[in-house]
């Protein structure tokens, strides 16, 4: 074998498998880009649906499956080709993923391993922590395994605490809540309401039970991994990391490259409206209310109407990202409505004074790392845990209270925004302190930075 072949065989190669929802795909793409810049070859396995959305959002992509930075995109079916609307229903999506994807991933890895005689070996599989089956597939082939948590460490600790919740009589063995109460897993952890546990928030009872059982299975799979990485910051979740000492914080992923000149939009699901950045440049610093609720459209028309009127009542400039929901009609010229925006750039622009958010973890981290106060409207999954961090632990935001209809009324919106954006406000001051904590974690001697370096060195050691 010649020297070039030896070099190819000695090149680390990581296969990355995200859960097929935008909030899970984006941090793993950011992580993949980081690894690629360290000289690691990446194969990123996406569903065909998400693969096509990402490719179509890339400007002038030179090749459909290879996007540079040593990242090769491949795709497999998700089983929802005949019922695409179920991709927006988390429970249905998870059930379909479990039925259709494991065999496809196994076949793909088997082909890749058969083709390594003249290329690179697979050093490690990095899988979303909710895909326990992917970890089991890697184990079947004797491949090193890493679980990646795109959520808060507290969310993972809740999953690890399921047996204790059963023993304490709070839930049944199928996840059904027996006692509605507020609990705290340890001092310093966010308080959690039992009727808002991650699996309980799903409306369909069968989906609740299926997801609960899947979480139990995933816990067993995670125990066999070499690494359990979390897109979080140790200093922001000290208590959670204390309860889960094997969880390794490496967040916030993507911060280092997100604002680099010439950085591609790899990871976007739709082309961004970049005109909004010019609009933000014309606004007074700290004056704009930024409104965005993630990729799952969960807000009904009555809530959209109340929110829109409440925002107009503030008489402040608003940038509203609608996502795949119906466009919002507003009469004020102070309000700019776009379908998708480059969120990291929006939040770092200096114009944003308040982030009205569903409290998805990516949005929570991105707001925190830019020192932005929040107004919180959580709906499901881990969003209630993240809201508790924002409002009760870090104290950088307020929750919006719903009325008897389950709707946040317009006057509540105006009142809370006025409180958050008051001149010399305490929320902005605390948010800037949280920003300092986040920036320290990704600095050269920060915990997240050091953990990333340790992981990269470990990957490279697999081929030496």
Curated annotation (Swiss-Prot):
It comes from the Eukaryota. Its EC number is 2.4.1.-. UDP-alpha-D-glucose binds at residues 295, 341-343, 358-366, 380-383. The keyword Glycosyltransferase applies. Keywords: Glycosyltransferase, Transferase. Transmembrane segments: none annotated. Pfam families: UDPGT. GO terms for molecular function: UDP-glycosyltransferase activity. SUPFAM superfamilies: UDP-Glycosyltransferase/glycogen phosphorylase (SSF53756). Belongs to the UDP-glycosyltransferase family. PANTHER family: GLUCOSYL/GLUCURONOSYL TRANSFERASES, UDP-GLYCOSYLTRANSFERASE 83A1-LIKE. This is UDP-glycosyltransferase 83A1. It comes from Arabidopsis thaliana. The lineage of its organism: Eukaryota, Viridiplantae, Streptophyta, Embryophyta, Tracheophyta.
